[in-house]
Amino acid sequence: MLMPKRVKWRKQQRGRMKGKATRGNFVAYGDFGIMALEPGWITSNQIEAARVAIARHIKRGGKVWIKIFPDKPVTRKPAETRMGSGKGSPEYWVAVVKPGRVMFEVGGVDEEVAKEALRLAIHKLPIKCKIVSREEAKVGGEANEGV
């Protein structure tokens, strides 16, 4: 599971997800990628499940790039605990994703294999996504028109 080695502060506020992604909104490394169409939190378990789904489908052929990292701790209080007595302890880590963000990329395999692998990975993620190619997502602004 992905998580930071060290953090300056153990707990964070929830924050809000406004607007579109301004960075990471084009396919930079591979030939095809998964682009988020709505905002959301993606846990480290979901990232790992999507990575495994892609890796199993492309076998040893291509390469997978994970372009998001879960750096936000989500806290949880124990069950049947009374209100108050402070914020709960960190339970898991999430990556904050905005619309237009390319989360995974695949390269080194042919188009059918890459698209099927990414389709399997999309089913592991909690937000709406679409598969984009390097040509479609060349300019971040143009690719985000449908977002």
Swiss-Prot record:
One of its GO terms (cellular component) is cytosolic large ribosomal subunit. Transmembrane segments: none annotated. The keyword Zinc does not apply. GO terms for molecular function: rRNA binding; structural constituent of ribosome; tRNA binding. InterPro entries: Ribosomal_uL16, Ribosomal_uL16_bact-type, Ribosomal_uL16_CS, Ribosomal_uL16_dom, Ribosomal_uL16_sf. GO terms for biological process: translation. Keywords: Ribonucleoprotein, Ribosomal protein, RNA-binding, rRNA-binding, tRNA-binding. CDD domains: Ribosomal_L16_L10e (cd01433). Gene3D superfamilies: Ribosomal protein L10e/L16. It comes from the Bacteria. Pfam families: Ribosomal_L16. PROSITE patterns: RIBOSOMAL_L16_1, RIBOSOMAL_L16_2. Binds 23S rRNA and is also seen to make contacts with the A and possibly P site tRNAs. Belongs to the universal ribosomal protein uL16 family. PANTHER family: 50S/60S RIBOSOMAL PROTEIN L16 (PTHR12220), LARGE RIBOSOMAL SUBUNIT PROTEIN UL16M (PTHR12220:SF13). Part of the 50S ribosomal subunit. NCBIfam families: rplP_bact. This is Large ribosomal subunit protein uL16. It comes from Caldicellulosiruptor bescii (strain ATCC BAA-1888 / DSM 6725 / KCTC 15123 / Z-1320). The lineage of its organism: Bacteria, Bacillati, Bacillota, Bacillota incertae sedis, Caldicellulosiruptorales. The gene is rplP.
